[in-house]
Amino acid sequence: MAKLAGQLVEALDGLLGVPVPLRVQAWDGSVAGPPGAPTVVLRNRRALRRLVWQPNELGLARAYVAGDLELAPGTDLYETLSAVARFAERPEIRTMALGPRDVIGPRGRKALGAVLRAGALGPEPTPPPEEVRRAQGRLHSRSRDRAAISHHYDVGNEFYGLVLGSSMVYSCAYWTPEAKSLEAAQEAKLDLICRKLGLRPGMRLLDVGCGWGSLLLHAAKHYGVTAVGVSISKEQVALARARVEEAGLADRVEVRLQDYREIADGPFDAISSVGMAEHVGSEQYRVYAEGLYRLLVPGGRLLNHQIARRPDIPGEPHRTSSFIDRYVFPDGELSPVGSTVARLEEAGFEVRDVESLREHYGLTLREWVANLEAHWTEAVRLVGRGRARVWRLYMAASALAFEQNRIGVNQVLAVRSTEEGSAGLPPTREEWLVRPAAGVPAATPVVTAAETDLGDSRSVR
């Protein structure tokens, strides 16, 4: 047993065909692997058994969330995840799809021998309770979407407050030179959205996926609009309504527990969708885009703030993160920004501006991780150690993904032009960022429920 770690590292290197960029400390205290590399600790045989049954990202995630795998004292989380990400992007690893048969088959003979000597062969361990087992219902039906949103957003408003800070904004901040704190950077982002939308007193704003109401409050306080926000998270809606009441804005801000496909009281002068479209899904994106187009007045603007993935590599299958789908955002789907622009224009919008905020999201996520770590004991009390570990892992890994250009985030400004073709924007970008467009768009008749309820029908791609 004294050489257990060495046997495991040798077996793993043989199975993968290339050296793994990590040191491994086994439960017997032995350590092996490249000197100076980040060190992971297999605390028990169950950790190894999880990796035998799922020799991939999901197996590592399950072991970490369950507490069977740890980082050695002094090992940096970001350094470890960065090493793993670089390794996973190697062509010979990126195209590899390992399963338990590879471990017990001829290719994994050394690995199987090491597992047997370690006494770790046995039934597959039960996944941690934080994992989503099997989603019920048709993909992106209203009931399945409600369950997916509840899994992530209904973990407790107090927990979100620890992570997000007082702004209660769950999307990337805007780190201007003047923004010296997370709260200031989030306020700068909210104001950027309001300026891009050209908000001014008397306008009617719809915020799709309004979260805890921060954008609604900012727009009503500083731009004089009346606003409607919708979310299908019960806990978000409850806190957003309380914040609206506390701010004395209940006469101008309404927060609804409502699916975006059920909004039936347009038109709106402006629509914002910030960090919500990732939950729509590719098959429903046309329904989403066409629905927002119908709810907007001619001359009105849409601000669609959305995370984007890189385009698929030609000749390779599309890959999704099993950890993110099982633990973080069930049924979430990312699309390349070009696909988002095309879908919006197919729905009738004219896209006028696309701004990448990729680096801003990396900075924001690092702030959230720091908040979580600073309040770790309280976070564990609120949501349990396993879920707190999920959040630490997902946010740190996401920060690196943005920083290393594996994913991005974009604000897409689109307009519903008038019949005459007017977009209602000043002639230069600089102008419409600092002041609203002149004139008030003509009101359009209120759309009836029968015309707007979009249902659960599958759209044609």
Q: How would you name each of these model-derived features?
A:
Residues P201-G209:
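Conserved class I S-adenosyl-L-methionine
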Residues R286-P298:
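A short glycine-rich, Lys/Arg-flanked "PGG" loop and its adjoining helix->strand segment in the class I
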Residues W212-Y223:
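Conserved SAM-binding loop of SAM-dependent methyltransferases across substrates and taxa
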Residues R261-I271:
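A short acidic, Gly/Pro-enriched loop at the edge of an enzyme's catalytic core
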Residues G299-I307:
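Conserved beta-strand signature within the Rossmann-like core of class I S-adenosyl-L-methionine
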Residues M1-K180, A185-Q186, L192:
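Feature captures hydrophobic
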